[in-house]
A protein has these predicted regions:
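Histidine- and aromatic-rich ligand-binding microenvironments
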Residues: 1, 14-17, 22-23, 51-52, ...
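Glycine-rich tight-turn/loop motif centered on a GG-T
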Residues: 298-311, 332-345, 385-390, 425-436
Length: 544
């Protein structure tokens, strides 16, 4: 509940207005609203309470317009695969977890990253089944786009390769036997099946507990509004029912009932339950994560091959070369292309998007590679959704791609928090200087509204960490990834506050008179890694 008293926060550094700017001073709040902002020396005298912040910073309430909130909530209660360093580690961990769990329970691991293994080779289905001993086992990697599953888990999810929209989402050997690696739709079906089985087994109180625990963690991280990029109707209903029990504002995009990656349809619209905190939206996936739809000059591919060869020689292992050729690469129109578009026919995409646009939905699109981003732009220019649109990721774009996208009016939701983890992979691809990675500055220059989001738990879910990486572009070794794409602290803070609202289809003008008193107090400059959020306020109430 909002504090009804007049409270003046003084002796602060205030990041206020739109566009955001800094000033020494503070602000006065009352009844859940900002009454005034003031410079140092002009503090109001007619207040019930005055809080001296001693030079701390006040920033607008932080948002995350792309955070897998419900999956993250479940992951906190299950096994962590991030420490695995080999296939044997994976199989040993699966075997041990299966020994210690009742036979009917799921065994779930997340955050696997086999690209960091000395020998980046995943277990086969036969090996997973041997370790699982007849149990339902599911392992998701860091992207939530690829995973491993036992035969029992696949059977429980009703997986059938030929019934998938993209049969290639279940890998096979040359002889047609299943390899055990699942992608996109197949991965999503097992994930949603497991999620329902797990939370239903524990009942309503457990469902509330895991959601409220995750909401509390978000508030502690200074988040005031979180948007889940895709939920089915039963989980939408769950969040809608729990919303009154947390001050964290929750919203979501509509997905199919079966999984996140298949295009939603008429039935998903009919059964949808929408948030009170954002316009209704629907999610379409145009490519994957590792399996992205992208192209680059042949010269970039040659650079990548040379580097992979040299790395393999210097490290005395085949890992770098194995990872390079893990994906299908074809020569098309004089460019090296990763041919992983989910919609081979753009007219099918236009038809599906038009249905939801005519129903008043905001269109949200996953497009990680530049080919997918251009397809998204062409679809949006044709459909022109009245509810607006957001396109997420756009990890690598050419200048020409950015020009095409700028004509759509859509928000670009980018995740610079991935820079420390993925900069090396981008450079190993030979993408620079032919493509712009995380092209925040280039998008801004072309007038594209930008949002900074996390894609948590796939990337860092700390909103200030993500904003900082947009400013400094730091890799793990301290050097910068394409420094020309740096943006200013004010631009970054705007992207993780007002930009987040724009991506969700809402409006936030920042800390200005008349606006909701939703803000965070930071111990120091928010762009110093040593600074931390010490208070979070939503609509005039301190929630952390």
């Amino acid at each position: 509940m909002a504090d009804s008293r007049d409270i003046a926060f003084k002796n602060a550094v205030l990041w206020w207005g739109s566009p955001i700017r800094k000033m020494q001073g503070g602000m006065k709040i009352s009844g859940g609203k900002i009454v005034s902002v003031f410079e140092k020396g002009q503090e109001p005298s007619d207040v019930h309470d005055a809080v001296d912040l001693g030079g701390r910073h006040i920033i607008p309430g932080l948002t995350d317009a792309h955070r897998h909130f419900c999956v993250t909530a479940l992951m906190a209660r299950h096994e962590d695969a991030s420490t695995w360093k080999s296939k044997q580690d994976a199989l040993d961990a699966i075997r041990e977890a299966c020994r210690s769990r009742p036979r009917e329970e799921w065994v779930f691991f997340s955050r696997m990253d086999h690209t960091k293994w000395l020998k980046p080779v995943l277990p086969t289905l036969a090996e997973v089944d041997s370790a699982a001993s007849g149990r339902k086992v599911f392992v998701s990697d860091t992207t939530l786009h690829r995973g491993l599953a036992s035969s029992e888990a696949m059977e429980r999810a009703g997986l059938d390769r030929q019934s998938l929209r993209c049969p290639g989402d279940m890998d096979t050997f040359l002889n047609g036997r299943l390899r055990g690696t699942l992608w996109e739709e197949a991965h999503g079906k097992v994930l949603f099946t497991m999620y329902r089985d797990v939370i239903d087994a524990y009942g309503d109180s457990y469902k509330r507990e895991i959601i409220l625990d995750e909401a509390k963690r978000c508030l502690q991280m200074s988040l005031t509004h979180v948007h889940d990029p895709g939920l089915p109707c039963d989980i939408q209903t769950l969040l809608k029912g729990i919303q009154p029990q947390t001050p964290l504002k929750l919203s979501w995009s509509v997905s199919t009932h079966e999984n996140l990656y298949t295009p939603p349809g008429v039935e998903d619209d009919a059964k949808a339950v929408h948030s009170d905190h954002a316009p209704k939206s629907v999610k379409f996936f145009l490519d994957g994560a590792h399996r992205t739809a992208a192209s680059m000059p042949v010269a970039a591919g040659l650079k990548a091959m040379v580097r992979a060869g040299l790395d393999s020689l210097s490290e005395r292992r085949l890992g770098p070369l194995q990872l390079l050729f893990e994906q299908k690469i074809v020569l098309k129109d004089g460019k090296l292309t990763l041919p992983y578009l989910r919609f081979q026919d753009i007219n099918e995409l236009k038809t599906k998007a038009s249905y939801f646009s005519e129903k008043g939905y905001r269109i949200v699109v996953h497009a990680l590679g530049n080919i997918a981003a251009v397809q998204a732009a062409r679809m949006l220019k044709a459909v022109r959704p009245a509810g607006g649109a957001s396109v997420e990721h756009m990890l690598i774009l050419t200048r020409e791609d950015i020009d095409v996208f700028a004509e759509t009016g859509a928000v670009a939701s980018i995740q610079p928090g991935f820079i420390p983890d993925y900069a090396d992979a981008i450079e190993r691809m030979g993408a620079i200087p032919y493509l712009k990675p995380f092209p925040l500055k280039s998008l801004l220059k072309r007038g594209v509204p930008i949002c900074i989001s996390s894609d948590g738990p796939c990337g860092s879910d700390d909103p200030l960490f993500n904003a900082r990486r947009a400013v400094d572009r730091k890799k793990t070794d301290g050097t910068m990834l394409d420094p020309d794409e740096r943006i200013s602290p004010e631009e970054a803070l705007s992207a993780v506050t007002a930009g987040g609202h724009a991506s969700m289809g809402t409006r936030n003008d920042g800390l200005v008179p008349g606006a909701p008193a939703t803000f965070c107090i930071v111990s120091g400059d928010p762009f110093l890694d040593s600074s931390r959020v010490i208070e979070t306020w939503i609509d005039g109430a301190k929630v952390f």
